[in-house]
């Protein structure tokens, strides 16, 4: 689960991390009132969406008068903001963050992520703040410094100080940087975050360490322990199809292809997408119906997939272990009839009640294309999507 920048900063402040003063706003008038409340002569008007690259897309503006605050708030609220992370369709901006301006002397990067290789939280830091960290990793990897944090000891003073010096924190600001990194780690650990990024972390003109931005992702499997974080969820920022799928315990992720996939098991689902790509096709989604899918769940899965107008064909790939092939066959037929299926449908199933499932499909009277293995299924669905 993702949250907005202003929500991430609320979490950081609870752990002693310094951030600019600011207020979330949902209207132009609220934005002006927030600037008046903050005082000063410079404010930053920031679009709040779940994507990076907002500044380059025109979603972050520096205002030097209340009139400019009003103008920029009016421009940004309601705009469709397109960044390298939103895709060409962009995101509709429905909320803003109005912050006090900052005197920036140096921009740094600090992030944390769960590292599967070391089975620890990895702290990553760079002197190249304000840039896309993937770009830095590709072109100047020597500028990224890492610490793999021992969960029993936490981030040690010596580790934090060493990282701070490597990324160019002024010597007099090292204690602040240490406190920041240890606060960030504590926030990461106690909220069950899967990713935290501060980009940029700045050194101000008077050598203060301030988190100018904040990005948090959380482990969805741990949200039951954090109702206060669940309350931060913004459904407007999520794919409606993924929200609908979650209501039926379906794991659904939208992709940009034209072949719908309905599979049981995450591993088989990924293998199915790989084989589709191998045969020249492009999957439109990842959809795992799980091991205990019912006819109702399969029907709902079809409905969700077919809301995507780009889908030209559907592949159902089922291994009947806990999931029986005859149940899937009944669900496929019910779904095809209920949604008035108009795109080609390829079904490959193997395992428990396989022959019964195939018999049910054959006797359904529907134009279902069957396949005996994954390669055959992928080839048939790719050809069908291409109108062959």
From Swiss-Prot:
User: SUPFAM superfamilies in the record, alphabetically?
Assistant: Glutathione synthetase ATP-binding domain-like (SSF56059), Succinyl-CoA synthetase domains (SSF52210)
Statement: the UniProt record of this protein carries the keyword GTP-binding: no
The pathway it acts in is: Carbohydrate metabolism; tricarboxylic acid cycle; succinate from succinyl-CoA (ligase route): step 1/1
Q: Which residues are recorded as binding Mg(2+)?
A: 199, 213
Question: Which GO terms of the molecular function aspect are on file?
Answer: ATP binding; magnesium ion binding; succinate-CoA ligase (ADP-forming) activity; succinate-CoA ligase (GDP-forming) activity
Q: Name one GO biological process term.
A: tricarboxylic acid cycle
Q: How does it assemble?
A: Heterotetramer of two alpha and two beta subunits.
Q: What is this protein called?
A: Succinate--CoA ligase [ADP-forming] subunit beta
Source species: Herminiimonas arsenicoxydans
């Amino acid at each position: 689960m993702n949250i907005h920048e202003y929500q991430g900063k609320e979490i950081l402040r609870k752990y002693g991390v310094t951030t600019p003063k600011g207020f979330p706003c949902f209207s132009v008038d609220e934005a002006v009132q927030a600037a008046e409340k903050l005082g000063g002569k410079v404010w930053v008007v920031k679009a709040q969406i779940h994507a990076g690259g907002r500044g380059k897309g025109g979603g972050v503006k520096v205002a030097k008068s209340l009139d400019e605050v009003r103008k920029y708030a009016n421009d940004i609220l309601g705009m469709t903001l397109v960044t390298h992370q939103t895709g060409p369709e962009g995101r509709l901006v429905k909320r803003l963050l109005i912050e006090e301006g900052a005197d920036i002397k140096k921009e740094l990067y600090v992030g944390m992520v769960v590292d599967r290789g070391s089975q620890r939280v990895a702290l990553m830091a760079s002197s190249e703040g304000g840039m896309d960290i993937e770009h830095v990793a590709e072109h100047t990897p020597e500028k990224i410094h890492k610490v793999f944090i021992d969960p029993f000891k936490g981030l040690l003073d010596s580790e934090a100080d060493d990282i701070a010096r490597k990324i160019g924190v002024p010597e007099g600001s090292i204690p602040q940087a240490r406190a920041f990194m240890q606060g960030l780690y504590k926030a990461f650990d106690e909220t069950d975050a899967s990713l935290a990024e501060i980009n940029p972390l700045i050194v101000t003109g008077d050598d203060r360490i301030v988190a100018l931005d904040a990005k948090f992702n959380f482990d969805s499997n741990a949200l039951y322990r954090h109702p206060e974080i669940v309350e931060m969820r913004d459904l407007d920022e999520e794919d409606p199809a993924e929200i609908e799928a979650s209501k039926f315990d379906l794991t659904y992720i939208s992709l940009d292809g034209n072949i719908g996939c309905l599979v049981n098991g995450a591993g088989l689902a990924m293998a199915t997408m790989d084989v589709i790509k191998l045969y020249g096709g492009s999957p439109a989604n990842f959809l795992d119906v799980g091991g205990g899918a019912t006819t109702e769940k399969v029907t709902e899965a079809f409905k969700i997939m077919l809301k995507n107008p780009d889908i030209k064909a559907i592949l159902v790939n089922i291994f009947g272990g806990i999931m029986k092939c005859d149940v899937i066959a009944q669900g496929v037929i019910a779904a095809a009839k209920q949604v008035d299926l108009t795109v080609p449908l390829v079904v490959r199933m193997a395992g428990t009640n396989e022959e019964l499932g195939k018999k049910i499909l054959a006797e359904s009277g529907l134009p279902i294309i069957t396949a005996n293995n994954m390669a055959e299924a992928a080839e048939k669905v790719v050809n069908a999507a291409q109108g062959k």
